[in-house]
Amino acid sequence: MKLAEGTVVGLIAGYYDVETAAGIVRTRARGVFRQKKQKPAVGDRVEIKIDDQGMSYLVKILPRLNRIGRPAVANVSHILLVISAVEPDFSLELLDRFLTFFSWQKVKVTIYLSKTDLLKGDKLAKIKEDLAYYQKIGYPVFTDYHDVEVKIPQMIKEGQIWTLAGQSGAGKSTLLNHLKKDANQVTGAISASLNRGKHTTRKVELFKLGEGFLADTPGFSSIDLTPIKLNELCNYFVEFKRASSKCKFRGCQHLKEPGCEVKKLLEEGQIMQHRYDDYLAMRTEISEGRLPEYLK
C-alpha cells in the first residue's frame, strides 16, 4: 500500500485521471466524498492510495485556491480570455463582465482578440484602440495569433493551471488545437441565428503546456455577477481600485460623492467612459438581482 499526490487532469464516466510523478493513474473516488457532498474537480491536487494489487483510490482533496466554471476547474492560476473581433461581434460589455468576474475570483487575465483576419480597416483599428486602454490598466493583450502561439507557453510557469474562457464561438477550442496539437477538441460552426457559437466542448481536460497546464472549458456568453456584494463591485475594476486611495471618503462608490478621484479621472479622459457606464450597469444588475436583457 502506498500514497501518491498528483493533479486531476481528466474526468470521464466516474473515473479520474491523475498525473503523478510516476505518470498518469486512472482512479475512482472513495464514497466518502459523496457522503460529504464533495466532488473532485479537474485541476484539484489530490492524494491517491495504491494497493498491492495495483488498484487505486482517490482518498483526499488537498486545499484549493479556487474552483471556477461549470464543469469546474480547480486551482486556476490565470485565465486566457478569448474575445472575438467578429462572429460573434466584439463586445466591450462582455469583456468587462468577464474581467470583473475574474477579478472577483482573484484570478489574473490575459486577453486574446481572435478572428482579426475576418475584420479589416477602421473597425479593427477601433477595437485595437479600445484594447490599448485595457493594456494600459494592466491586462496583457494579444491581437496576433502567432504571438499567442509563441508567448503563451513561455508565460505558463511550473505547476500553473491556465484556463481558456470567453464567449461561445470565439475560437477557444480552435486556439487550443493549435497550442496543443493532440488536444482533439471538437470545433464547431457559429449559430448564425443567435450570433453565438454552439457549445462544442463537452468536458474539461488539462493539457501540458509550457511548464504547467492549459484547460479548455465549455463556451459561455454570460457571467452571473449577482453574487458580488454591491459595495465591493468597484474594487473589481482595477483602475477604480487604484484611484480610490485618493478619494476623499473611504468606501467611495464613485457615484455622486464629493472628492471622488475616479470621477475626476473620468472627466479628464484617463478612465474610459465605457468602463464607467458598464460599472453603473453592473450596479443596477446586482442591486436588482437579475441578468440584463441582452444576456437572457
Curated annotation (Swiss-Prot):
Top-level taxonomic group: Bacteria
Keywords, ordered alphabetically: Cytoplasm, GTP-binding, Hydrolase, Metal-binding, Nucleotide-binding, Ribosome biogenesis, RNA-binding, rRNA-binding, Zinc
GO cellular component: cytoplasm
Cofactor binding annotation: Binds 1 zinc ion per subunit.
A Pfam family reported for this protein in Swiss-Prot or TrEMBL: RsgA_GTPase
InterPro entries for the chain: G_CP_dom, NA-bd_OB-fold, P-loop_NTPase, Ribosome_biogen_GTPase_RsgA, RsgA_GTPase_dom, RsgA_N
Disulfide pairings: none
Main location: cytoplasm
One Gene Ontology MF term: GTP binding
Cofactor dependence: Zn(2+)
Swiss-Prot/TrEMBL GO biological process terms: ribosomal small subunit biogenesis
Domain CP-type G: 65-223
SUPFAM superfamilies in alphabetical order: Nucleic acid-binding proteins, P-loop containing nucleoside triphosphate hydrolases
Entry-linked PROSITE patterns: ENGC_GTPASE, G_CP
Role of this protein: One of several proteins that assist in the late maturation steps of the functional core of the 30S ribosomal subunit. Helps release RbfA from mature subunits. May play a role in the assembly of ribosomal proteins into the subunit. Circularly permuted GTPase that catalyzes slow GTP hydrolysis, GTPase activity is stimulated by the 30S ribosomal subunit.
UniProt similarity note: Belongs to the TRAFAC class YlqF/YawG GTPase family. RsgA subfamily.
Family matches, as HAMAP family: GTPase_RsgA
Quaternary structure note: Monomer. Associates with 30S ribosomal subunit, binds 16S rRNA.
Official protein name in the record: Small ribosomal subunit biogenesis GTPase RsgA
Biological source species: Lactobacillus helveticus (strain DPC 4571)
Lineage of the species this protein comes from: Bacteria, Bacillati, Bacillota, Bacilli, Lactobacillales
